[in-house]
UniProtKB/Swiss-Prot annotation:
HAMAP family: NAD_Glyc3P_dehydrog (MF_00394). GO terms for molecular function: glycerol-3-phosphate dehydrogenase [NAD(P)+] activity; NAD binding. This is Glycerol-3-phosphate dehydrogenase [NAD(P)+]. It is found in: Cytoplasm. The gene is gpsA. GO terms for cellular component: cytosol. It is an enzyme of class 1 (oxidoreductase). Pfam families: NAD_Gly3P_dh_C, NAD_Gly3P_dh_N. Gene3D superfamilies: N-(1-d-carboxylethyl)-l-norvaline Dehydrogenase, domain 2 (1.10.1040.10), NAD(P)-binding Rossmann-like Domain (3.40.50.720). Pathway: Membrane lipid metabolism; glycerophospholipid metabolism. Keywords: Cytoplasm, Lipid biosynthesis, Lipid metabolism, NAD, NADP, Nucleotide-binding, Oxidoreductase, Phospholipid biosynthesis, Phospholipid metabolism.
Amino acid sequence: MAEKIAVLGAGSWGSVLANMLTENGHDVTLWSRNEEQVKQLNTEHTNPRYMKDFVYSTNLTATTDMKKAVKGASVVLIVIPTKGLREVAKQLNAILTELHQKPLVIHATKGLEQNTYKRPSEMLSEDISPENRQAIVVLSGPSHAEDVAIKDMTAVTAACEDLASAKKAQKLFSNSYFRVYTNDDVIGAEFGAALKNIIAIGAGAIQGLGYHDNARAALITRGLAEIRRLGVAFGANPMTFIGLSGVGDLVVTATSKNSRNWRAGYQLGQGKKLQDVIDNMGMVIEGVYTTKAAYELSRKRQVQMPITEALYRVLYEGEDIKTAISQLMDRDLTSENE
């Protein structure tokens, strides 16, 4: 059955998901603050800043008016970086109160909040009143927007403690090239989605320094061990980390040049300064903020995360990237299961 869906956030992932939902037969309105971006989407059906050369469905409508996008929507999909998530959630909450609507909320945000280190679903549950929403579903997994745009085969996870809501999201998104599995482990799905960006920066740095496949494989594998340890410390199911929102998302993000976190790490490995990398990218590099969050959380929970600690020193204390990588190899020898 066709649903009326509001998609908040018109970056690469938000706009491509909105386009796919439109082609799945749903009535979709895409919201963005940027008037020029909305004009291009509505008249030229393009989004050149984020998806160069991709042409969007003529049935997809964009607007700068969030109330217009949300009015009558049974589903709200939020695809906003963590830094701006609360502001959008509060604006949405006020609109839902005014409209007396209670939609299903789905988010595809990957990261942890600065300072509080909260997961996206925690932020949304605080800022969108229970009377204004149904459950909150997490959509996560190995899914570059560029691949989904060309209808390359993709599989992701819809995670929610209420499996009926996860199954509803599953039906909304699934099609011949985009397969959705369900999971009830929101904590694991969100930690996997956020922390993999840290390891992707490290993987990019490894290659930027000139190391090859063995080094990259070692870093990704040991990085997964770190992600699992921290997630489990917060109550996640360890099995989630060998699924799509865990190892799946990690592999695609830490091995692909489409990953902005990998590209940022690669430039750091080549000797560029962090601020120059950020300026050059022109987009949010979630892994930079997530590194600090994970570093602080690991210290509070006394969880060993040596790769994260090394990258924290590079990103926030100015340590040389090559020195940090060398120190990882010089650590005391230990069991793989520790």
